[in-house]
Amino acid sequence: MKNSIGVLSVSKFYHSAVKAELKRRGFQKNTAKKIIKTHKEIMNRAKEIGNSRLVSSYVMGSYFIALNRSTGRSAEENYEIFRDGLCASKLFHKIMGDADSYLDPKRIPARRQWSEDSHKRKYENDWVVDILPGNDEYDLGYDYHECGICKLCQDEGCPELAAYLCRMDY
């Protein structure tokens, strides 16, 4: 995958959050270096997904795979490291926004266009999704038919890791 400014920025963000968590947990300094090196190797092999709305999730998938290959810890513990690092990040909370901004009706047309475009399957590893209008159970729904993280994990020979990343979808 191309190392665009967006990809590099997201990679740096995830790395800084995880690096701080590794330090809090007493990992050796070279662990963070090993993770970023492995992450770069995975991203170089990763299939292109274009200017996807979920490029940050794709980068997250690569980074989580690298974390699992570098720490010697279980996937569950690596999930906790990643989750806790993100939750401790002030920038993460700013980026996430709140429910009102997420559910802003002005965003719905762009989401519907994204859904329509996703069904064209322009990029093999991109997501395919339907945007569902709210009902009595939820305000806004996403029905994912194909998941870029699942595809990346499959390509990297670790499909079992995708389930941990689904837990980060909040």
What does each model-found stretch correspond to?
Residues 59-61, 65-156, 162:
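Amphipathic interaction/junction segments at domain boundaries or subunit interfaces
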